[in-house]
Amino acid sequence: MGRLENKTAVITGAATGIGQATAEVFANEGARVIIGDINKDQMEETVDAIRKNGGQAESFHLDVSDENSVKAFADQIKDACGTIDILFNNAGVDQEGGKVHEYPVDLFDRIIAVDLRGTFLCSKYLIPLMLENGGSIINTSSMSGRAADLDRSGYNAAKGGITNLTKAMAIDYARNGIRVNSISPGTIETPLIDKLAGTKEQEMGEQFREANKWITPLGRLGQPKEMATVALFLASDDSSYVTGEDITADGGIMAYTWPGKMLIEEKWKEETK
């Protein structure tokens, strides 16, 4: 029997990357998976893959930055399922924009709208479907919410906000039997990384990945399924006494005092396979 047998799980941003991997893992563990994403074609591919593997999945269009879209999404889920047990707020965007005085206001607003406000909106309209039976909410934050990156003030602000919003929600809903936690991934091999840094086949992308091998104590980028299994822990009864927490899954980057030292330390380079 799977760890999520007879549970209904809603996952946003599940067309690709961490969300897609989590949808597949949850379905394999017995959950009925409801996927929401702005990318209809890729979202349907995720649903088809789950069904071909014997799982239960369905999808509804969702733009987390649009309140009316979120309301409609929640209404569709209520009509289809009545209640839900798990909400994984995973939808997000990222883009460099320069230093704060150079940073485009519309880019800052866009990242806040999708990443932070989107997490708030989906929680606001889907939590009512959890109040009767309780459950688990998981929010995707980032190691960038704990420590800042150059030229990414919008993303840093959004993810830092998600980490603290998670704590606020955990306090608000603990007595309703709803646990709320966040995951802070490190650098994960997803289409978002391809967009930000280049693909493995491109020189820029290859250099980025090589640098991350040095910076990351475990010596590699993470894989989407490794984040999905963290989400599975938080969604399941295995974490029944865990709420208000942020789990950092970054290969050890945040444990190091000065990760930049790894780029110039010859001994570390020699030990990096």
Swiss-Prot record:
Gene3D superfamilies assigned to the protein according to its UniProt record, in alphabetical order: NAD(P)-binding Rossmann-like Domain
Record keywords, A-Z: NAD, Oxidoreductase
Enzyme class: oxidoreductase
Amino acids binding substrate: 142
Positions bound to NAD(+): 10-34
EC number in record: 1.-.-.-
Keyword check for ATP-binding: no
Single annotated GO MF: oxidoreductase activity
Sequence similarity: Belongs to the short-chain dehydrogenases/reductases (SDR) family.
Protein name: Uncharacterized oxidoreductase YxbG
Organism: Bacillus subtilis (strain 168)
Gene: yxbG
